[in-house]
Amino acid sequence: MALEALTSPRLASPIPPLFEDSSVFHGVEHWTKGKRSKRSRSDFHHQNLTEEEYLAFCLMLLARDNRQPPPPPAVEKLSYKCSVCDKTFSSYQALGGHKASHRKNLSQTLSGGGDDHSTSSATTTSAVTTGSGKSHVCTICNKSFPSGQALGGHKRCHYEGNNNINTSSVSNSEGAGSTSHVSSSHRGFDLNIPPIPEFSMVNGDDEVMSPMPAKKPRFDFPVKLQL
């Protein structure tokens, strides 16, 4: 309605006497600012303004307003601090990338060797915790890791070492079994095999002995005749 009022031929006509009178205009301006006077109020109410004219008048007052919008509130910059070297970073992603360098240096130190005391102290001082403040500790060698995935990969080393020990023991036991088998083969029999039943066999060249008692052999001597 305000645009129609501005473009209407009625408003295109010369300014009505209300706006020509500077005293009345300033009185209306004071009334809009909160400082009202009896004279301006009475002069303003004596004029018969339609709704469209009143809206056009309000638009003119708004166009003369020189106030600027308030500046936006300053965004508070959050700083993320490293718990190892006390460096600050603008974002959590930058802090995570910085902590990865600490973990890399720690792994290189552990792989390089050193006495147990220095290794344990380095592990305790440069132990990196997760965002929740919890650290994952190995129950076998008491090493701490920043995540559960790293701890799981570390425990595989322990499991693979145990498997190698088991395979070596199995190979040793197999070697012992083969040695016992060879020694038993040298003896001519195996204790794990039941014995074969023995039968009374006689050589083929010998005669079969009868169960009857043998007869006494007869000796024939030549008879000498005496003449």
Curated annotation (Swiss-Prot):
GO molecular function, one term: transcription cis-regulatory region binding
Composition bias, Polar residues: 174-186
Primary residence: nucleus
Record keywords: Metal-binding, Nucleus, Repeat, Repressor, Transcription, Transcription regulation, Zinc, Zinc-finger
Protein's GO biological process: cellular response to hypoxia; multicellular organism growth; negative regulation of DNA-templated transcription; photoprotection; photosynthesis; response to abscisic acid; response to chitin; response to cold
Region of interest: Disordered: 96-128, 168-189
Organs and tissues of expression: Expressed in roots, stems and leaves.
Keyword Nucleus: yes
Induction (free text): By salt, cold and drought stresses. Down-regulated by gibberellin.
Superkingdom in the source lineage: Eukaryota
Zinc finger (C2H2-type): 80-102, 136-158
Keyword Repeat in annotation: yes
Location of the protein in the cell: Nucleus
Function: Transcriptional repressor involved in abiotic stress responses. Can repress the stress responsive genes DREB1A and LTI78. Probably involved in jasmonate (JA) early signaling response. May regulate the expression of the JA biosynthesis gene LOX3 and control the expression of TIFY10A/JAZ1, a key repressor in the JA signaling cascade.
Name of the protein in its database record: Zinc finger protein ZAT10
